[in-house]
Amino acid sequence: MFAVVKASGFQRLVEVGSVISIDPTNVDSGGFVHFPVLLLVDGAEVVSDPDKLRLARVSAKFLRKLRGPKVRIHKFKNKTGYHKRQGHRQGVYVFSVTSIERGD
């Protein structure tokens, strides 16, 4: 069974056991979160009806916090000698999908 969920403003294709990385949310260590389901695929059956999807539920367990790759920003202005370097690393939370329930 597959599901498309909305997580941190992005759509992710998940199945039970898959690991996803998203932007930080409010969750405790070892806690569970539930993602809204946008599409559900169970074998040959595809569920896209919003009324049925409100009952569906995808649960994921929080695994760990990570930091993403370093992004380097360099501002430069010609002929003035002005330049500025700056770096940024975005925080990332890693979740493992534990269950996908249809809610029928």
Curated annotation (Swiss-Prot):
Output the HAMAP family linked to this UniProt entry. Ribosomal_bL21
Lineage, top ranks: Bacteria, Bacillati, Actinomycetota, Actinomycetes, Micrococcales
Q: Which GO terms describe its biological process?
A: translation
Q: How is the subunit organization of this protein annotated in UniProt?
A: Part of the 50S ribosomal subunit. Contacts protein L20.
Q: Which molecular-function annotations from GO does this UniProt entry contain?
A: rRNA binding; structural constituent of ribosome
Q: Which residues form a coiled coil?
A: none
Cited Pfam families: Ribosomal_L21p
InterPro entries in the cross-refs: bL21-like (IPR028909), bL21-like_sf (IPR036164), Ribosomal_bL21 (IPR001787)
Q: Tell me the disulfide pairings in this chain.
A: none
Provide the protein name: Large ribosomal subunit protein bL21
The function of this protein is: This protein binds to 23S rRNA in the presence of protein L20.
- Where do transmembrane segments lie in this chain? none
Q: Which family does the similarity line name?
A: Belongs to the bacterial ribosomal protein bL21 family.
User: What's a single GO CC term here?
Assistant: ribonucleoprotein complex
The alphabetized UniProt keywords are: Ribonucleoprotein, Ribosomal protein, RNA-binding, rRNA-binding
